Amino acid sequence: MDQSVLNRTLELIKPCPGLLNHVQEVAKLATHVSGTLGLNEKTLKMAALVHDVGKYSWPQELHSKYPLYTRDLQIVRTHPLVGEKILCEFWPEIPKTIRQLVRWHHERPGGLGYPDQLHNPPIEVLVLAACDVYSAITSDRPYRPGVLAVDQALIEVAKFAPPQVVAALADAISKQCVNY
């Protein structure tokens, strides 16, 4: 990824409360987990750093609003597609894998995710999703404190991620890739 593309993307998300820290934490975790599983660390790291760029399009108040109502959830669920579009504009030669990871980071096995309801998301998608969910659960948000219990957060991740991903994530956490 061209450094200027990464810089432009990170500049977009800076005004979003906590988002820059979140994507940096997800990138650290995803790099460790992908390395443990023999996946492409560079690809997962790049995708993690830009996976939430679509949140840039949200109304500012949505970043700290709770609870979210039906209309709010409709907006929230657009961010993978908006992020993919932004990246394609910034980076016309974006690798297909990174584009797909950004688009699919909320996909879950059995067609339970969005935006495409994939039944069998690729392992890379589940790695990014697991790291994203872990970071989201354990981080403080304007409307709630983060969960402090690592085990509690990993139980949530295990609801959709394969055991090898959960184990690699637990290893990353134990090696203090992130604060816990």
Enumerate the language-model features and the residues they cover.
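Histidine- and acidic-residue-rich, metal-dependent catalytic cores
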Residues: 2-180
